[in-house]
């Protein structure tokens, strides 16, 4: 704990704010508006993430949203890592909170999967590979994107802990809990058998 706080509270707070400022950029909304598609919040789930952008029929735009939402998790963490591990973790938390609760949109943001991935890429690429393997395996077998993301996110802190990254594991325990909370509607649909499957239209 002492090591994590070594940079001092002003630096930790600055890293948190930096992360939040990056995470709060609503790329899904910005890209769809620039593409002349209107407000993405008015279609599908009303979410600003890549999955809902895909419902516009623009795969390239959805891919760009996914990439940008991931990078806004990766870049502030990498920048803050120059100050130490504590600031890097603070920036990761800030980026994730910014994506979920952007001040510009009345604190109504995305569900966090892409930004979760982006933060994980910066802090533990090896664990990201495990995340991807779990997601792809379940997505291929069960055809549920949400279930795959939920399972992979739940496994992430356990994998990090097993690898000896206690502080990072603690951060991702918090991020995974928030991700599950934001996916509450998906969890209810999964339980009811009404969740949409990958590749299914309508």
Swiss-Prot record:
Listed InterPro entries: G3P_acylTferase_PlsY
Predominant cellular place of this UniProt entry's protein: membrane
Localisation: Cell inner membrane
Transmembrane region(s): 11-31, 87-107, 116-136, 158-178
Pfam families, sorted: G3P_acyltransf
Entry GO CC: plasma membrane
Membrane topology listed for this record: Multi-pass membrane protein
GO molecular function terms listed in the Swiss-Prot or TrEMBL record: acyl-phosphate glycerol-3-phosphate acyltransferase activity
Catalytic activity: an acyl phosphate + sn-glycerol 3-phosphate = a 1-acyl-sn-glycero-3-phosphate + phosphate
Functional pathway: Lipid metabolism; phospholipid metabolism
Top-level class of the enzyme under EC nomenclature: transferase
PANTHER family (alphabetical): GLYCEROL-3-PHOSPHATE ACYLTRANSFERASE-RELATED, INNER MEMBRANE PROTEIN YGIH
Family: Belongs to the PlsY family.
Quaternary context: Probably interacts with PlsX.
HAMAP family per UniProt: PlsY
Role, per record: Catalyzes the transfer of an acyl group from acyl-phosphate (acyl-PO(4)) to glycerol-3-phosphate (G3P) to form lysophosphatidic acid (LPA). This enzyme utilizes acyl-phosphate as fatty acyl donor, but not acyl-CoA or acyl-ACP.
NCBIfam families associated with the record: glycerol-3-phosphate 1-O-acyltransferase PlsY
Protein name, per record: Glycerol-3-phosphate acyltransferase
């Amino acid at each position: 704990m002492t090591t994590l706080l070594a940079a001092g509270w002003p630096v930790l707070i600055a890293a948190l704010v930096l992360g939040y400022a990056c995470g709060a950029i609503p790329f899904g909304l910005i890209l769809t508006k620039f593409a002349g598609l209107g407000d993405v919040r008015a279609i599908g789930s009303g979410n600003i993430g890549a999955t809902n952008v895909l419902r516009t029929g623009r795969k390239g735009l959805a891919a760009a949203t996914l990439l940008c939402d991931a990078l806004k998790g990766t870049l502030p963490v990498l920048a803050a890592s120059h100050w130490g591990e504590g600031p890097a973790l603070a920036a990761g938390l800030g980026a994730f909170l910014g994506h979920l609760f952007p001040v510009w949109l009345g604190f109504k943001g995305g569900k966090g999967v892409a930004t979760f991935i982006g933060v994980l890429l910066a802090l533990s690429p090896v664990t990201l590979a495990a995340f991807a393997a779990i997601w792809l395996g379940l997505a291929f077998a069960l055809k549920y994107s949400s279930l795959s993301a939920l399972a992979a996110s739940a496994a992430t802190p356990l994998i990090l802990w097993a690898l000896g990254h206690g502080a990072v594991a603690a951060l991702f325990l918090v991020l995974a809990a928030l991700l599950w909370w934001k996916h509450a509607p998906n969890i209810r649909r999964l339980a009811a058998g009404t969740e949409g499957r990958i590749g299914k239209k309508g």
